[in-house]
Amino acid sequence: MNNVKVPKIPGGGAISTLLKVGIIGGLGLYGATHSLYNVEGGHRAIMFNRLVGIKDKVYPEGTHLMIPWFERPVIYDVRARPYLVESTSGSRDLQMVKIGLRVLTRPMADQLPEIYRSLGENYSERVLPSIINETLKAVVAQYNASQLITQREAVSREIRKILTERAANFNVALDDVSITNLTFGKEFTAAIEAKQVAAQEAERAKFIVEKAEQDKRSAVIRAQGEAKSAQLIGQAIANNQAFITLRKIEAAREIAQTIANSANKVYLSSDDLLLNLQGMNLDVDAKN
């Protein structure tokens, strides 16, 4: 048996070489494809290492290297995103208020390793609902229901101030906080509508009174003008009888002009035109 020789396979060395090259090439291709990762615009990455855990370095946008299997990137979106919350709270005068809040939130990029250690990737769902609801209840309780309407901007500023401080404790930044809607109970809403109707009625009554006063002043001024006109006409008649003759001539001319423009032909005597030329005193007073 010891003298038995195994025949050599033709081309065995070439196959072995090709096999080695294939294995090495496959490992190289695997390493090349799994040792690179991309960080898109508006994102940041941190690295989890199986030996040391989360590294403190934050990786910016671009392509980066990692050790396959030993390292794994965790990518965060650091752009501001809207978050909507609705909460029902009691005001200082015990009115139930449903308030809607919109916040623009983003993680602090330089604190991403700490955020991952304490909150994980879904940090917003773990932090924002609790601190927003707590802040809304605390702030709304300081105002009456009517003040929430008239001082809405001040309420929004106070909510923003408290929320910004609370969120910073969790390494979360708030770029904007705004109240989107305020909804009150049926009784309070009915009271507000009744108050608005009363205010409108009061304004309408005020307008009517002012209009009546204006009409009264206009009537007085008109009466004074007519009295003055009558006085002047009386003085003119007393001073010169020809004034009456002039008025008669003007009246007759207006009547004649109206008849001339009419489609029907009418013949009137001078007496019908209020114009009695024979009875008129056309002589001018010598004094004039």
UniProtKB/Swiss-Prot annotation:
Family under the similarity heading: Belongs to the prohibitin family.
Coiled-coil zones: 186-219
KW Cytoplasm (keyword) present: no
Pfam families cross-referenced by the UniProt entry: Band_7 (PF01145)
GO cellular component, one term: mitochondrial inner membrane
Record membrane topology: Single-pass type II membrane protein
Topological domain ranges for the Mitochondrial matrix compartment: 1-10
Keywords: Coiled coil, Membrane, Mitochondrion, Mitochondrion inner membrane, Signal-anchor, Transmembrane, Transmembrane helix
Tissues in which the UniProt entry reports expression: Mostly expressed in proliferative tissues, including vasculature, shoot and root apical tissues.
UniProt source species: Arabidopsis thaliana
Residues in compartment: Mitochondrial intermembrane: 31-288
Intracellular or extracellular location(s): Mitochondrion inner membrane
Keyword Membrane: yes
PANTHER family linked: PROHIBITIN (PTHR23222), PROHIBITIN-2 (PTHR23222:SF1)
Subunit composition and interactions: Component of a prohibitin multimeric complex in mitochondrial membranes.
Transmembrane stretches, start-end: 11-30
Name used for this protein in its record: Prohibitin-1, mitochondrial
Gene3D superfamilies: Band 7 domain
Function field: Prohibitin probably acts as a holdase/unfoldase for the stabilization of newly synthesized mitochondrial proteins.
